[in-house]
């Protein structure tokens, strides 16, 4: 659903809206994961976040938390295992090859928090 579009909406606006909507879903998931592991780092590897660097600050700002690049292969499987180990109280290795760390912009994050509230409200209305 594209909410708020009008006759002045350009293809560039739509592309940005799609990027931000995806980032907000990542933020919703990230918020849930950070409740389980408050000190966890949000790490990404591969896929669109690695291949579309312009999307990285959008996701980082939506999350409101640092976003750490990983150069590890199979990083998603590794991350799931680390989360499980942490919940079991097992000491976690910190030896993965890190890429760049992005820091969120607080002003942008506040805007994205309000946008996530609107997105969640829209999802509830559409159920």
Language model regions located:
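Glycine/Thr-rich phosphate-binding loops that ligate phosphate moieties of nucleotide
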Residues: 1-127
